[in-house]
C-alpha cells in the first residue's frame, strides 16, 4: 500500500505523466495459499486460506446490501483472478518508484506487530 501512495505522489508531482496510463501490479504472483504461508511464517501463527463457494460469496454480498448485478459482477472478477487471467506483473510500478517494489513478505515483516 505504501508503494502505491509513493507511486501516486511521484506521478502527481512529477513531469511527463500527462495522458499516460500505467499498469500498477505487485512484484510477485501469489496465490491465496502463498499469502497465507507468508503470514504464517512471519507471525508464527497458523494462517489458512479459505476460498468459499460462489453461493456463499453471492449470499454474503447480497446480505450486505450489494445489488444483484454488482454482486454477480464481483463473482466474475473473482473467477478472473482464480483462473489466473489477471496473473501479470508489470514493470510500471518499479519504474515509477525508482526502486524495487515491496514484496508481501517484506510488508508482513515490516508490519508484523499489526498482525500478531
How should each PLM-predicted stretch be described?
Residues 1-3:
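A conserved structural motif in NAD(P)-dependent oxidoreductases
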Residues 5-73, 85-116:
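Mid/C-terminal beta-alpha module of Rossmann-like enzyme folds, strongest
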Residues 78-84:
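Short glycine/proline-rich, acidic loop/turn segments that cap or connect secondary-structure elements
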Amino acid at each position: 500500500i505504501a508503494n502505491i501512495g509513493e507511486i501516486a505522489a511521484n506521478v502527481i508531482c512529477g513531469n511527463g505523466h500527462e495522458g499516460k496510463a500505467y499498469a500498477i501490479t505487485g512484484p510477485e504472483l501469489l496465490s491465496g495459499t502463498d499469502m497465507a504461508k507468508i503470514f504464517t511464517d512471519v507471525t508464527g501463527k497458523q494462517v489458512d486460506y479459505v476460498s468459499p463457494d460462489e453461493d456463499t460469496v453471492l449470499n454474503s454480498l447480497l446480505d450486505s446490501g450489494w445489488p444483484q448485478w454488482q454482486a454477480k459482477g464481483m463473482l466474475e472478477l473473482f473467477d478472473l483472478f482464480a483462473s489466473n487471467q489477471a496473473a501479470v506483473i508489470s514493470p510500471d510500478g518499479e519504474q515509477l518508484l525508482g526502486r524495487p517494489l515491496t514484496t508481501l513478505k517484506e510488508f508482513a515483516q515490516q508490519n508484523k506487530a499489526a498482525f500478531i
